Amino acid sequence: MTTMSDLSVDLVGEILSRVPLTSLSAVRCTCKSWNTLSKHQIFGKAELAATKQFLGFTVMDYKVCSLRFDLQGIRNDGDDFVDHGEVYDVFHSDGLLLCVTKDHWRLVVWNPYLGQIRWIRARKQFGYSNMFSLGYNNSNRNHKIIEVSYVYDKTACPQYSEIYDFNSSSWRLVEINPVWFLHSDRVSLKGNTYFFAQDLLKDAKIENYLLCFDFTAERFGPHLPLPVHSYDDVTLSCVRQEQLALLYGNNETDDSLEIWITNQIDPNAVSWSIFLKVDIKPLIGFPKDFDPGSFFIDEEKKVVVVYDLDGHLYSTKKNCAYQRLYIIGEDGYFTSVKIKCSDSPEFSAYAPSLVTYKPTNYAK
């Protein structure tokens, strides 16, 4: 009699590739050999690429939800994170999700593919203005978290910064002496985090620039130029975990939407090239008050899938049941998709990985 353990590797791979990412842990428990196999090989990655789907995570009803996007619409894959506290922010790096909990004391690092969870307790209670980012040391792949704490006074300067080290399981203060303000829009790439930043010096212009936190050197790099002169209305994303992408568009002052991607990117240097420029005047139904948020690009089809932030900050569950994603491409291609109104105005693009770390129990 044939058992689950007798199935060929190819057939097991086909079965596992059809399982939603957040359900893999439950499926692994059904067969020891399946569990071993899936912890040494990523299934489903080729299928995502073949179907031109984008996998991402967001927060809905204070739960982490996985979503799949393609040019036909959006699908909610379900949620396997229900019993691990209420979450209000999620950040992706290296196949790991850094989840910030609503109790303002605990962080959770989660590998959805492997099902590993690590609870981390903050050194002191944090507020909604505190920003957390995840990265790693490029010399030894040791993962770290940086926390930048803000107190919104007349200067709006960061008050302190701390780093959590996975190897030592401890926090320590770091000196950064900032004269800039970091926007919440940030992206992880090759172990480092790239932020939009703005000078706070009285005689400085307020134009945005790019700023990288290097997790290997544990310091911020120099100001990196953006490809457009922008004071707002710019959003970051990444392409295949290899390049940064930038979306610029303000239809109150401009008639086009621009997507730029990096030719070169490291903590100390960047160069850009235009990927897509769309004239939005002919697009019937394009909103006048469009406020671009998280986005994904399809390099082959030259389209962008972008989340409209307009009204999110002023919405409640009573007056906002749905928000919209817009799919925009060359030659006037334009359509929209409704999505349930989320707690977080951002999506974290996700790429599965086999990164492992020492799991911990619930952090009290």
UniProtKB/Swiss-Prot annotation:
Domain F-box: from-to ranges: 2-49
PANTHER family: BNACNNG10540D PROTEIN (PTHR31672), F-BOX PROTEIN CPR30-LIKE (PTHR31672:SF13)
Protein name: F-box protein At1g59680
Annotated CDD domains: F-box_AtFBW1-like
InterPro entries found in the cross-reference section: F-box-assoc_dom_typ1 (IPR006527), F-box-assoc_interact_dom (IPR017451), F-box-like_dom_sf (IPR036047), F-box_dom (IPR001810), Gal_Oxase/kelch_b-propeller (IPR011043), SCF_F-box_component (IPR050796)
Phylogenetic lineage: Eukaryota, Viridiplantae, Streptophyta, Embryophyta, Tracheophyta
Domain of life: Eukaryota
